[in-house]
Curated annotation (Swiss-Prot):
It comes from Burkholderia pseudomallei (strain K96243). The gene is hisI. Zn(2+) binds at C85, C102, C109. Keywords: Amino-acid biosynthesis, Cytoplasm, Histidine biosynthesis, Hydrolase, Magnesium, Metal-binding, Zinc. It catalyses: 1-(5-phospho-beta-D-ribosyl)-5'-AMP + H2O = 1-(5-phospho-beta-D-ribosyl)-5-[(5-phospho-beta-D-ribosylamino)methylideneamino]imidazole-4-carboxamide. The lineage of its organism: Bacteria, Pseudomonadati, Pseudomonadota, Betaproteobacteria, Burkholderiales. It holds the Pfam family PRA-CH. Mg(2+) binds at D84, D86, D88. This is Phosphoribosyl-AMP cyclohydrolase. Disulfide bonds: none annotated. One of its GO terms (molecular function) is magnesium ion binding. It is found in: Cytoplasm. SUPFAM superfamilies: HisI-like. One of its GO terms (biological process) is L-histidine biosynthetic process. Homodimer.
Length: 138
C-alpha cells in the first residue's frame, strides 16, 4: 500500500507495499547482470539494506529479518538499489560473496530450465552445484 502523499525524503513511502507490508525483490549480479534470486522485504529490511549496504530480506516463513549470508556466509554487498516503474518491485545490484546465492549451493536460484513442449516438458537443472549444501549449513 503506497502512501499517495509521500513527502520529499520519505523514500519508503514511495514504495508500493503489498497488503502484508512487503515488496518483491530481485537480486542481480552487479558485474554480469545475472539474476541471482528473488525474495521479499518489509520497510525495516529495505532501510537496513540501505544503511548497511548489505542485503537484508524479510523471511515470511520465519517472520523476521533475514540477513543474507547470516548462516551460509554468502553475503550480498549492495552496490545499487532501484525501484521499478510501478514502484512495486525492488532491484538490488549486488556483489555475491563466494559466488553462491542459492541455498542449493548454486550461483543462482534460477537453475532450472524448461525443456520440451507444453505436452511433454520438464524442468531440468542446468547449473552446477558449486558447494554441497551439507557443507554450507552446519
Amino acid at each position: 500500500m503506497m502512501n499517495a502523499e509521500a513527502k520529499p525524503g520519505d523514500w519508503l513511502g514511495k514504495v508500493r507495499w503489498d497488503a502484508n507490508g512487503l515488496v518483491p525483490v530481485i537480486a542481480q549480479d552487479a558485474a554480469t547482470n545475472d539474476v541471482l534470486m528473488f525474495a521479499w522485504m518489509n520497510r525495516d529490511a529495505l532501510a537496513k539494506t540501505i544503511e548497511l549496504k548489505r542485503a537484508v530480506y524479510y523471511s515470511r516463513s520465519r517472520q523476521r529479518l533475514w540477513f543474507k549470508g547470516e548462516e551460509s556466509g554468502h553475503v550480498q554487498h549492495v552496490h545499487e538499489v532501484r525501484l521499478d516503474c510501478d514502484e512495486d518491485v525492488v532491484l538490488l545490484k549486488v556483489e555475491q560473496v563466494e559466488g553462491i546465492a542459492c541455498h542449493t549451493g548454486r550461483r543462482s536460484c534460477f537453475f532450472q530450465k524448461f525443456e520440451g513442449t507444453v505436452d511433454d516438458g520438464e524442468w531440468v537443472a542446468v547449473d552446477p552445484v558449486l558447494k554441497d549444501p551439507e557443507h554450507i549449513y552446519k
